[in-house]
């Protein structure tokens, strides 16, 4: 029977390590890292990714991707998957979808987001939710197990920028979907 576990908490709360510890003595684990190093990425993020890589057991498989996770799960048969994390996957999908919507590669995505109307925002949110639904469906179809790490969001002030508000709301929608399915 397929199993989905959701681990949530604040930024830097240790949730990734908790998830890794759950599978520490397991073999056949595939770690799906949703933050991928890009050419223009800042050194702080590169260091964070490096630390995460170093923490993983040597016999785990690492798959760095945030797109087509459901297809990857359907095409493979690992005993367990650890997806770290849904928030980064959402962020990456969001910026890809905005750039695609405005044919703006690499472009100025910040300006594009400021121009977005309600229908465009809802369209992107729907697409992102569909991606996560496909991941859950792929687990059910293959009877596999996955733990997903995600950030708790929305407990503080209302973000000042439109971009931050859209992302906060999108993270919340993703977390609702995953919580219902886990």
Where are these regions (language model features)?
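Conserved P-loop
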Residues: 2-75
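Conserved, surface-exposed functional patches that form binding/active-site neighborhoods
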Residues: 80-106
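Acidic, metal-coordinating catalytic segment for phosphate/diphosphate chemistry
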Residues: 151
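Catalytic-core regions built around general acid/base machinery
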Residues: 130-143, 174-177, 181
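Loop/turn-to-beta-strand initiation segments
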Residues: 77-80, 142-147
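Phosphate-binding/switch region of NTP-binding enzymes
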Residues: 161-182
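A solvent-exposed, charged loop/short amphipathic helix patch at secondary-structure junctions
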Residues: 98-124
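Short, solvent-exposed loop/turn segments at secondary-structure junctions
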Residues: 90, 155-162
